[in-house]
Amino acid sequence: MELIEKHRSFQGYQEVYRHSSKVTNCDMQFALYSPDNCIDIPVLYFLSGITCTEQNFIQKSGFQEFASKNQIAVVVPDTSPRGENIPDDEDYKLGCGAGFYLNATQEPWLKHYNMYDYITKELPDIIANNYKFSNSKVGIFGHSMGGGG
């Protein structure tokens, strides 16, 4: 796991990480806001809408103040696999930015578009193995495509 951004925000840090995903067979990015003294605190996962990345929510929403004040960690994954070898489509509703948080069942999407497993298994395992947040106080919410996730 590689830290690619870190910014002080209220009483905590906004970070962005890149890691090699076994589920999506490519590098993935996610954002993490963690308040200071963040042991055994609740974790919320935010799922962004279509065409977004992990950057949209962390740059536009202002959630960091609330999360800091209420001692809540917030994880924001990218919405799909990305990269040179990732299948894409001209229609914005398919391909990069449009993973729909589902596992693909057909080619050419099958190898990389396994976002359900990424969101429900791999990413929570990464967070649990690297941070001492609560394992029992976990929630998920989203907007647009992410609201159906």
Regions found by a protein language model. Name each.
Residues 1-149:
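Non-catalytic cap/lid and distal C-terminal segments of serine-dependent acyl enzymes
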